């Protein structure tokens, strides 16, 4: 059997029948996917009760000139762990370059650089991530729980989080109003 194609650098869009309310209308930026599992960061939901300035203050980082923007809920795994998904114009020592499209950094140096106005041009901050064990995501893809689509930077960085799923579906040529959670049988 052939190994599944890597979804790294793509967006996963939750289909209506995904069956897990944590992922309803989810948009996941896929950062790693191989035979051992997969990791992505959700870019569609705002984390309630915390903004960037609040997070920086908790981490003893002066917010400096950083905008006080929303923090996103990156996924259900390790929600106390932070991730910055950002453009490739800034690379830290521990940044993960994802298909020459964007980077994922989970160290304080990127937050300090953002606060000082020396960070990446485009970025978002998320707490938590979406993770899948060996073969798990591949099974969900076979059951049509997710749609993989091209990850356009504008979808990730420019649209407001609640609108990203619909915008990504439309970008993939799908009218979300026409999707059904269940299908019939002949």
UniProtKB/Swiss-Prot annotation:
Pfam families: DUF179 (PF02622). It comes from the Bacteria. InterPro entries: AlgH-like. One of its GO terms (cellular component) is cytosol. Belongs to the UPF0301 (AlgH) family. HAMAP family: UPF0301. This is UPF0301 protein Swit_2673. It comes from Rhizorhabdus wittichii (strain DSM 6014 / CCUG 31198 / JCM 15750 / NBRC 105917 / EY 4224 / RW1).
């Amino acid at each position: 059997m052939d190994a599944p194609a890597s979804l790294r650098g793509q967006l996963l869009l939750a289909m209506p029948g995904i069956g897990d309310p944590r992922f309803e209308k989810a948009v996941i930026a896929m950062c790693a996917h191989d035979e051992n599992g997969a990791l992505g960061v959700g870019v569609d939901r705002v984390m309630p009760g915390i903004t960037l300035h609040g997070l920086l203050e908790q981490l003893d980082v002066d917010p400096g000139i950083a905008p006080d923007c929303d923090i996103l809920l990156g996924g259900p795994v390790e929600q106390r762990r932070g991730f910055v998904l950002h453009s490739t114009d800034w690379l830290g020592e521990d940044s993960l370059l994802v298909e020459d499209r964007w980077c994922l950094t989970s160290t304080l140096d990127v937050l300090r650089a953002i606060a000082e106005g020396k960070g990446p041009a485009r970025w978002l901050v998320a707490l938590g991530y979406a993770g899948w064990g060996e073969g798990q995501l591949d099974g969900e893809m076979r059951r049509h729980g997710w749609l993989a689509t091209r990850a356009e930077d504008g979808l990730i960085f420019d649209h407001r989080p609640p609108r990203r799923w619909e915008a990504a579906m439309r970008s993939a040529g799908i009218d979300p109003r026409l999707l059904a959670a269940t299908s019939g049988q002949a």
